[in-house]
Amino acid sequence: MQSATDIRIPDMKPCLPGFEHVSRSWDRMHGCYAAKILPGEYYVTIHDEAIVTVLGSCVSACIRDKVFGIGGMNHFMLPEDSGGGDDVLVPGGKAARYGGFAMEQMINDILKNGGLRKNLEVKIFGGGKIIRNMDTMDIGQRNIDFVRRYIETEELTLVSEDVGNVFPRKVIYFPATGRVRIKKLRNMHNTTIARRETDYRRKIVEKPVGGDVELF
C-alpha cells in the first residue's frame, strides 16, 4: 500500500510572465500547486492549480473563462479620496479608478492568455466588517458596493458571492473548474488580518492610481 509520503509530487509548471513574485507551493490536501496572494496582488493561471488568499474587509474577484479554464483572483481594498470622503461610485474618483485598475489588470491578463470576454464568469468574496473603531465608514461594504457596480457596468456575469458579515474568510479558488472553497475564520485571526489590511490601506492612500488598461 502506498503511503502519503511515497506519492510523487509533480514538477511545478512555470507561471505566466509577470507572476514570478507570487509564492507557490504544493497543496497536499487538494493535490495541486497553490499560489498565495496578499493584499494588492492578483494571480492568473492557465494551469490546474489553486489560488489562495485570506480576506478581512478586502474583497477578491475570482474570474475565469468557463470554456477554456483560464482564470485568476485578485485581492484589493479601495483607498479613500484625498478629502476622506467616499468616492466609490463617482466616475473618475480615486477609489473608482483604483478599483477599476485592480479589476482590469486581471481581466486583461486572462484575455491576453486565451480567455474570451464573452465566456467570463465572476465570483466575489470578502468585505467583512472586521476593522473596528477605525472610522465611521464600513470599509468592507464600500468594497462590496464597488465590485458589484463594476460587474454590472462592465456587463460581466456574476454567478455567486459570499460577502459581508463580521468574519474573515480563507478563499481557495480553482480557475480550471470554477470551484471555490471558503473557510470562515475564528475571531483569533482578526487581529493579524486587521493589522495587515490597515498597513495596506495606509500604503494605498498615497500610492498613485495605475494607468488605464485597455481591455481586449
Model-derived features: where do they sit?
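Short acidic-hydrophobic catalytic motif
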Residues: 1-58, 65-68, 74-91, 95-121, ...
